[in-house]
Amino acid sequence: MSLLEAIAELHVIPYTDVLAWVVMAAFIAGVAADYRDNLLAARRLTAGAWWLFAVFWFVLIQHFAFVHRSVVQTVLILIAVPACLYVGWLVFAGRDSLLTLSRAVAFMTVIYLPFETSELARGLLIEAVAFQTATVIDALSLADGMEYMQDPDEGSTLMNTFWFPETGRASRVVFECTGIGAMSIFGGLIAAVNAPLRRKAVGIALSISIIWVLNIGRNVFIALANGYQWFAYSWLEGPIMALFGLTDPARVSFFVADRVLAQLLAVVALAGLAWFIARWVPELLDIAEELLSIVGIDVELHHPSVDRTDTDPAD
């Protein structure tokens, strides 16, 4: 067994599930202290939550680098670890403007964790996304002969697999393919800002709807790219197999479609979506300004279609 294979055999997810609940509890405790105007306790609890969050991401480096083999996500996590440590230090030192961002993280975990840790909720979400992905592929006649079937893995009863007889390749919709992570981020950010409830509701409804549609399109693209081997070019095989530690050339199309193109485009799409949603919830720009200021970029962001002096720019 190679060193990479040995590292990939390590299982950290059960421990990170427990740690995630601890992190959520710490952030919620900080939010509760803030609501009770106990600023000193809020700073200490929230700073501790950020430092625990750094530990959480650090533990996940192995999973995303050697099991999931995602370059984009691994780079983001490597940035997240020192960023969480630094934000925690700033909060502890009295930078109270970061309590809004901390409140957003608390809401994100409240949205995300029940789906991630509940087998029933996770299964329902996966099957809903898989069914709609298969429906779009069939409706657009993009894959003649594709079979939508039950997960062949032993012990799984989920209808989440697309098999392409023409190439013998199959793709599965798993939890990471549901878009719940992005929906949790936007839901948490919008819930955390100080804005009228109606505008927040519009922002959440729009962001979740757009993310859901984009995610279905993403799954359609990945399933077809893998099923029909769209990126099976000899000049791609060497670099991609070396980058991701692959031994089977038939997996190159999947990794190019998912780990490279889809994930890079997702970062761009989410940034664009945040700018779009700021039309209804311009308070999101305050969080963006705060994040930029952490890295030494002091700017004042203005959405071109929003008057920041208006109390309800959605009207």
From Swiss-Prot:
| Active-site residues, record numbering mapped to chain | C177, R218
Predominant subcellular localization, coarse grouping: membrane
List, alphabetically, the InterPro entries matched.
Answer: ArtA, Exo/Archaeosortase_dom
Which keywords does this Swiss-Prot/TrEMBL entry list? Cell membrane, Hydrolase, Membrane, Protease, Transmembrane, Transmembrane helix
User: Its membrane topology, per UniProt?
Assistant: Multi-pass membrane protein
The GO terms describing molecular function are:
peptidase activity
| Site, as annotated: Transition state stabilizer | R259
Cellular-component GO terms for this entry: plasma membrane
For this protein, the parts annotated as crossing the membrane are 12-32, 47-67, 74-94, 173-193, 204-224, 227-247, 260-280
- EC numbers for this chain: 3.4.22.-
Is Lipid metabolism included in the keywords of this UniProt record? no
The protein's location, in the record's own words, is:
Cell membrane
Q: Which GO BP annotation is one of this protein's?
A: proteolysis
Q: What class of enzyme is it?
A: hydrolase
Instruction: State its role.
Output: Transpeptidase that recognizes and modifies its substrate by proteolytic cleavage of a sorting signal. Following cleavage, a covalent intermediate is formed via a thioester bond between the archaeosortase and its substrate, which is then transferred and covalently attached to the cell membrane.
Q: Which family does it belong to?
A: Belongs to the exosortase/archaeosortase family. Archaeosortase A subfamily.
User: Under what name is this protein listed?
Assistant: Archaeosortase A
The organism of origin for this protein: Natronomonas pharaonis (strain ATCC 35678 / DSM 2160 / CIP 103997 / JCM 8858 / NBRC 14720 / NCIMB 2260 / Gabara)
Gene behind the chain: artA
